[in-house]
């Protein structure tokens, strides 16, 4: 009976975390335009550190453990819109030149093999 209850609790916790993440993405729209993403990042920078501190204080009170002070989160000094989709652009450019590069490398390899077998 206990393993069933424990597995149900794990499922409910995982489902709650996943549902919360989906709701957060829907509500804050961090995958939308860059100005909304920047606003969501700034809001997270303001809200998350106090929440983590408050939770750690609660855990300390309940368990009697001492949790060391966490270092301050790093500050990002760049705008998201400058780097928005830069990874996608790099991957697509690499994929677009992949056939010609593969042909070039295979030609070089073939020439190398011809030279070595003579």
Swiss-Prot record:
<comment type="similarity">
    <text>Belongs to the MICOS complex subunit Mic13 family.</text>
</comment>
<keyword id="KW-0812">Transmembrane</keyword>
<protein>
    <recommendedName>
        <fullName>MICOS complex subunit MIC13</fullName>
    </recommendedName>
</protein>
<dbReference type="GO" id="GO:0042407">
    <property type="term" value="P:cristae formation"/>
</dbReference>
<feature type="topological domain" description="Mitochondrial matrix">
    <location>
        <begin position="1"/>
        <end position="7"/>
    </location>
</feature>
<comment type="function">
    <text>Component of the MICOS complex, a large protein complex of the mitochondrial inner membrane that plays crucial roles in the maintenance of crista junctions, inner membrane architecture, and formation of contact sites to the outer membrane. Constituent of mature MICOS complex, it is required for the formation of cristae junction (CJ) and maintenance of cristae morphology. Required for the incorporation of MICOS10/MIC10 into the MICOS complex.</text>
</comment>
<dbReference type="GO" id="GO:0044284">
    <property type="term" value="C:mitochondrial crista junction"/>
</dbReference>
<keyword id="KW-1133">Transmembrane helix</keyword>
<feature type="topological domain" description="Mitochondrial intermembrane">
    <location>
        <begin position="27"/>
        <end position="118"/>
    </location>
</feature>
<dbReference type="GO" id="GO:0005743">
    <property type="term" value="C:mitochondrial inner membrane"/>
</dbReference>
<comment type="subunit">
    <text>Component of the mitochondrial contact site and cristae organizing system (MICOS) complex, composed of at least MICOS10/MIC10, CHCHD3/MIC19, CHCHD6/MIC25, APOO/MIC26, MICOS13/MIC13, APOOL/MIC27 and IMMT/MIC60. The MICOS complex associates with mitochondrial outer membrane proteins SAMM50, MTX1 and MTX2 (together described as components of the mitochondrial outer membrane sorting assembly machinery (SAM) complex) and DNAJC11, mitochondrial inner membrane protein TMEM11 and with HSPA9.</text>
</comment>
<keyword id="KW-0999">Mitochondrion inner membrane</keyword>
<keyword id="KW-0496">Mitochondrion</keyword>
<dbReference type="GO" id="GO:0061617">
    <property type="term" value="C:MICOS complex"/>
</dbReference>
<keyword id="KW-0472">Membrane</keyword>
<feature type="transmembrane region" description="Helical">
    <location>
        <begin position="8"/>
        <end position="26"/>
    </location>
</feature>
<dbReference type="InterPro" id="IPR026769">
    <property type="entry name" value="Mic13"/>
</dbReference>
<dbReference type="Pfam" id="PF15884">
    <property type="entry name" value="QIL1"/>
</dbReference>
